[in-house]
Amino acid sequence: MARKRKGRDISGWLVVDKPAGMTSTAVVNKVRWALGANKAGHAGTLDPEATGVLAIALGEATKTVPYITDALKAYVFTVRLGQATNTDDAEGEVIASSDLRPTDEQIKDALAPFLGDIMQVPPKFSAVKIDGQRAYKLARDGEDVELAARPLWVEELLMLDRPDPDHVLLEMTCGKGGYVRSIARDLGAALGCYGHVRELRRIWSGPFEAEDGITLEQVEALAKTPELDSYLRPLEEGLADLPELKCSPEGAQRLRNGNPGMVYPGEAEYGDEAWASFEGRAVAVGIYKSGELHPARVFARPE
């Protein structure tokens, strides 16, 4: 018999403005402890030294994590020109350098090939698996890691500032699976001067923005208090990119039992993925067909 998780049965999202110097998993564990939650997970890893939006799902909201993971995200980051590191960020060892410094116009021109559908090779120090092992573990052991290129959608890549010849501030909006460190590395290569990420901040992810996030200091200060609960965002915010279809009491009951349930007409078309709601609360996510939602995920929450 499976052991029952200890903790409160709460569902929703807590948007944390992650500090530098912590892993995403450590932040999730801190939030789970502070809220006394029985289940928690994040919607997209940030490197330990990165800051910004870390959206943490609690309880039944963990079923909506894939929709945030798949959503567009935006990053502001500083590229250090003239140096390559083995980790493609400032934490690594400098492995190559150049005295060449591109002009602002050369940098802007070099950004264009990174837009749209591109193929990107992840950093060697990343969580990508190779034959069942994390690439960063192999790289730490001195193995020559070869990673395959992966597709990435880059919606926007802008130059925001050039504070000095060695640094350039960029903003990127991209889809799932993007590595900002790879952008810095490949931009440096395209400019012929090398490059790595100096600082990185995720400013928004799907519907969640860093400026609306709670700090980890606040989480710790409000731990185990009702005040911390007030920062919880509804589970439904994780479904913001899907059409909502309202359902009747009978339809809601059928959906809760895992069966197709009748929904009222809305913006979804036949075959679309959508979510059904009853009295403003999400009941299920599934495929819309002929006036019914065929559930793939059902949200089991108290009435």
From Swiss-Prot:
Lineage of source species: Bacteria, Pseudomonadati, Pseudomonadota, Alphaproteobacteria, Rhodobacterales
Write down the chemical reaction(s) this protein catalyses.
uridine(55) in tRNA = pseudouridine(55) in tRNA
Where's the active site on this chain? Answer: D47
Instruction: Enumerate the InterPro entries for this protein.
Output: PsdUridine_synth_cat_dom_sf, PsdUridine_synth_N, tRNA_psdUridine_synth_TruB, TruB_C
Query: Can you tell me which family this protein belongs to?
Result: Belongs to the pseudouridine synthase TruB family. Type 1 subfamily.
Protein name, UniProt field: tRNA pseudouridine synthase B
| The protein's Enzyme Commission number | 5.4.99.25
Report the top EC class in one word: isomerase
Q: Which Pfam families does this one have?
A: TruB_C_2 (PF16198), TruB_N (PF01509)
